[in-house]
């Protein structure tokens, strides 16, 4: 019970001391009266005697007037002579003199008689309530009620959706009440006997009369001699407490430190059963009608009239006590009880199977406050730790008059409060738009308290009458919460209230997307006030953005129309709350970086920088999830970008900056959130680790709660997923893997040799670089695709023009992924930076080559190609990039490996492999602009050549005003059947799965065909198109069409029909454009349905269909064969019927590819078929085959193969 001593020490009764030296007080009046010496009875007063009424005290003073004192002859009553006396009597009287003659400049409130006395000699849990309610002086505020909502059963199913629905109506009030449907009655585990009678909780002592009307603590103790008096008094009380077993004397000095602030002291512990008894006794005694009572305080129940005051009476009495109390009213409140320790009032999901279906329903409900913070759509799901009171609910067990003072939620979050049982709880709310008005009104009415504690509203210990707020122009609304009802508070809405009796409520926070702007304001205020944060706002903001990108990816590419994806898709808009908040935050970050970080070292922040513990600025406690500043003098000490100069006194050159993302990457994220599909594609691959192909790394993928995909890489895999997964390879291995068309993407790499050792603190630095791709270079060899770009190899020559002999086989690997939405500026080749071969660096650039735009319900990314002129793999050329900041990382020379961040990109790798074999060169360079064709943006990628002026050679910005207006192009009125002469190039292999076939056709992976159609670049001519089926990942095919003469023109979709429909739309777009330019002899606009996608792929050709059917020997394509129960494959076809030489321009007739028993394949065909088979085999299988062929007769092998074929048939 040492807390009792603390409470006594902080008391202000009879401890009010003047603020000037004794004997020099100035009095308002000069009434002469005799000085009354202290009597023996005065010294022996007990706390019970001190609580007598003011009338009795006046009577005692009149009776004591008869006593004579030697010093009563002094004629100067305005001078306090008691301070000059040396005898013990006058010294003992100093306290009384100080309390009777207060300093006029120190507005210390006079002591009030005790209205509640807790504990006695017989028991410590009883109470004596001497105060009585004053119905004639009630001060019930005249307020409007907050809105009440009654959701239907259907509306009640989706918690956050319903809150979003009522927000426009309720937010202006700051608070509202939600009454669940009558059928929603969750069981309460707290009412179980073992909890009700066995679990104890702690309470807080609240002085209701001091919530509004109290003096500043600084005015109570100003002088040292007065402090000594209070200390002596506390020590004396401490000794008495020790005698009574209540504490120890040293506790008194501890209490002295708390004189500087006002707060709620800890109270005794109770069980729910005992606290209900205590609360009911208080209310019954305070509001009882009759004055009859027994002398035994512990049996006060016998004299209580059993009646319940009206709620209006309780409200009026409460605000009378707060406004103008006549007694000390002390109550207890079980506030902020952690449900993780004491237990929740809602059922939790149990691992046992004994739970009933009804309990399971409530345990999984979105209105269960244990589930509420992390519901789908709440940003708090991205907070990994269980923050008590924010993500873990708190319990509030109240009694009559127990209060919660004016405050807003941490980070201005939403809060939801549910009352499990008990008397009503009265709430008062002020809308977020009026929060500043309330703060100004409270500072005006309580200036001394705010001067002493500027952050007083953060302490939750100050109340102010709603009537006074209303007078000050602050709109306040009342809300009465009953058992079984919810109360919802909105962001930055101030709220306060009290309980009208014994009750139990539970509350927790939530953060829907519309909270983000309020949360941003909150952290800026916290930074100014130097207040600690509870959650990482930037982490939640980026988590929401990633979720939107992931939803866009799954909806557009995987057709996952789930409820969660549709919910997040709704936030994917340029003018949406998420996009605006993210853009504002990035603009703020850009400004700070440009202002501070231009001349300093910038490093890549590790992904686990704040994974285990929150990183905060050591100056203002700003969250450091996105960026931080540090110094070498203190490795574990960081600051925000604003306070980097105050971090330490070291020179500026010793400082460094940590960035989770560079600004270009963040800009990509903004575009992705705004709905730009190219940015969605790039960010999904770059940050989330999502890819359309999973063949490259045969690894398992797991998606965490933030939407990131984590893969478990295999030892042979060189293509990695995720930004932070790194693979070390030697330069020879890099060269070898590139020759094997290794799948490397996502990161721009610039590898150089390094002679000196570089410390880890110099691992990344911002650099600028412009490069140009020169197609006239005879050393142009091959390009590998990166994410939206390509990897090119070229020999780096020294300044003398000779090839650097120290360079490795593929000296420089530059992965450029620049996407240009505007005409690019001319750059210069930075060969001087890499010719010396003295440093090994890694340079990263954001992706800028893929351009995808969502213009249909379902679309897929365009995987582009660059460079029409591709030859043998020998050297590397630089690719054009924007003039932009990039990040450079120096790698220590002690290792012979390059740390390569890479990502699996099976789709782009497959495209690139065919670029080297199918490209004939000579294609016209086109500008890298997105052209909306109705289904997807068609991307023209700038190839190796471009004009020196930087102007695109084929611009799409032709204005209609530049040409004479003509009538529009003709439209074909009849859909004519195109004579499709489809030429199969490769039949591929059949895969099992419903997505790899339909009732109409089988879709073999790797199938390729060739057909002639209108040229999208020159509609007056026809050209050849290559149709191909790729593996899109997630066990589904992806259909791709591209120009054989210009592989940079790519059309990709999940449907063959839609894929060719996009080609038709692009043709019509070009026809319209050239018609406006005045060109004649143009074909008519192609109507919808012409051409047919299945026909253009070759599925109308019986020979091709039969060849594909023959591939499915085991009939794994069940949907296709179920629709053809009497069909069976007639003959086997080779998987690769036609392998053309790269330099062959002739066309082979492949109509008669059917193999008869006597058919002989040419030696070239045999080699090609064997190569295909060998590539499908593993190293172990190839080694075994080599041993068998070297030691066994070939005839035996032939017989075994024939036997196996017969068995499989």
From Swiss-Prot:
Main location: nucleus
Any one cellular-component term (Gene Ontology): nucleus
Domain of life of the native organism: Eukaryota
Cofactor note: Binds 1 Fe(2+) ion per subunit.
Keywords, sorted A to Z: Chromatin regulator, Dioxygenase, Iron, Meiosis, Metal-binding, Nucleus, Oxidoreductase, Repressor, Transcription, Transcription regulation, Zinc, Zinc-finger
The keyword Protein biosynthesis is assigned to this record: no
Protein name per its UniProtKB record: Putative lysine-specific demethylase JMJ16
Tissues showing expression: Confined to inflorescences.
Record function comment: Functions as a histone H3 'Lys-4' (H3K4me) demethylase involved in the negative regulation of gene expression. Active on H3K4me1, H3K4me2 and H3K4me3. Not active on mono-, di- and trimethylated H3K9, H3K27 and H3K36 in somatic cells. However, also active on H3K9 when in complex with MMD1, a meiocyte-specific histone reader. Together with MMD1, promotes gene expression in male meiocytes in an H3K9me3-dependent manner, and contributes to meiotic chromosome condensation by triggering some condensin promoters (e.g. CAP-D3 and CAP-H).
Region annotated Disordered, chain positions: 872-900
FYR C-terminal domain location: 1034-1124
Taxonomic source organism: Arabidopsis thaliana (Mouse-ear cress)
InterPro entries: FYrich_C, FYrich_N, JmjC_dom, JmjN, Znf_C5HC2
Protein's cellular compartments: Nucleus
Every JmjN domain range: 146-187
Domain FYR N-terminal: residue ranges: 974-1032
Gene disruption phenotype: No visible phenotype under normal growth conditions. Abnormal accumulation of reactive oxygen species (ROS). Hypermethylation of histone H3 'Lys-4' (H3K4me3). Enhanced expression of genes involved in leaf senescence (e.g. WRKY53 and SAG201) associated with H3K4me3 leading to an early leaf senescence phenotype. Partial sterility with abnormally short siliques and dead pollen grains leading to silique abortion. Male meiocytes are defective in meiotic chromosome condensation. Slightly early flowering.
Quaternary structure annotation from Swiss-Prot or TrEMBL: Interacts with MMD1 in the nucleus of male meiocytes, especially on pachytene chromosomes.
Cofactor(s) listed in the protein's UniProt record: Fe(2+)
Sequence motif: Nuclear localization signal, positions: 217-224
Chain positions recorded as Fe cation binding sites: 407, 409, 495
Annotated phenotype, changing residue 407 to A: Abolished H3K4 demethylase activity leading to early leaf senescence
Variant or mutagenesis effect after changing residue 409 to A: Abolished H3K4 demethylase activity leading to early leaf senescence
Residue numbers binding Zn(2+) 1: 617, 620, 640, 643
EC number: 1.14.11.-
Binding residues annotated for Zn(2+) 2, in chain numbering: 631, 633, 648, 650
